[in-house]
Amino acid sequence: MYLKSLQLRYFRNYREQVIDFAAPKTILVGQNAQGKSNLLEAVELLSTLRSHRSHRDRELVLSGQENGQIIATIERDSGPLDLTLNLRSNGRRTLMVNSEPVRRHLDFLGHLNAVEFSSLDLDLVRGTPAERRNWLDNVLIQLEPFYAHLLQQYNHVLRQRNAFLKSYQREGSLDHTELKLWDQQLASTGTRLTRRRQRLLVRLAPLATHWHQAISGKNEDLQVHYAPNVPLEGDEPEAIYQAFLEKLQQKAIAEQHQGTSLVGPHRDEVELIINQTPARQYGSQGQQRTLVLALKLAELKLIEEVIGEPPLLLLDDVLAELDLQRQNQLLETIQDRFQTLITTTHLGAFDAQWLKSAQILEVAGGVIFNSNHCDRR
């Protein structure tokens, strides 16, 4: 999988920009707030239709404009592919694959796979459970685009059920028949999410443990555990569904009192344990970076294994923050097999071999141009 070109129109701080990628590694260098991360965000949007930096499309469209656009040309084993994402400040999107409109997100997702590693990913360790759930969901969307539909379905049921519980708080009367219907829908959609998250971590956890040992010199033992809100006993859908309903019964009074749903995968946790200690309580920022790097390498390898092609790797202002050992581990892993886009404010911390084989682009005020150091092939 190779991203050949990217065209940005009225996206973030870009007016009109076309970037042709000429090497397996591209380094985007520039001061802060010039547009480096915006370019990686555009790739992320094409990959998952989600942004880890914004939940509102009006923030993605250049100020003063109504519409923005991202177009990518990709080379896959199956042949070339054009992807177009049209953004509107009112939140309505249109999607195209090879210039043909697609109505369902499902038909757009899965064409471009990318793994992003940014300084914000330290929140995987020290942040809330929601950060770790969001990470799981993004991986699943790439491995199984249908998961995006299941997640949307679940969140819709969750919002409706919460609105129903809040109406009980206001009005003081409860329609038990309607509540039972919402319980069944929440349990049904929630079961489908829970099973997929469980299966993902069964495959991802050993890879993360392997990479963590390799990077830390086998001095630390990482364990990654799925802690679902509804405890799992096996993978049988009916058993999980019944366990879901039972827990809803147990929490019924508390939910009615609080006016919100207390049961379901929206309250799952992913436990990260180093040497039998929760990682958020463990060690330095460097050790936390090691953990996140191990998770990202595991994600990279699993996506490659499942889709049969190496995904893109997006490194947003993190490579220069890694010490030489971690840099070398990352270099050794990706080599030239994974196309890599890297942002940085300076080139001083980079390995000479990286610079020698990389395309170097400068970014200033939403404009990208070739550096004097650029490989001009």
Swiss-Prot record:
The keyword RNA-binding does not apply. It comes from the Bacteria. It is found in: Cytoplasm. InterPro entries: DNA-binding_RecF, DNA-binding_RecF_CS, P-loop_NTPase, RecF/RecN/SMC_N, RecF_2. Its main location: cytoplasm. GO terms for biological process: DNA replication; DNA synthesis involved in DNA repair; double-strand break repair; SOS response. One of its GO terms (cellular component) is cytoplasm. Pfam families: SMC_N. ATP binds at residues 30-37. One of its GO terms (molecular function) is ATP binding. Keywords: ATP-binding, Cytoplasm, DNA damage, DNA repair, DNA replication, DNA-binding, Nucleotide-binding, SOS response. Belongs to the RecF family. The RecF protein is involved in DNA metabolism; it is required for DNA replication and normal SOS inducibility. RecF binds preferentially to single-stranded, linear DNA. It also seems to bind ATP. This is DNA replication and repair protein RecF. It comes from Cyanothece sp. (strain PCC 7425 / ATCC 29141).
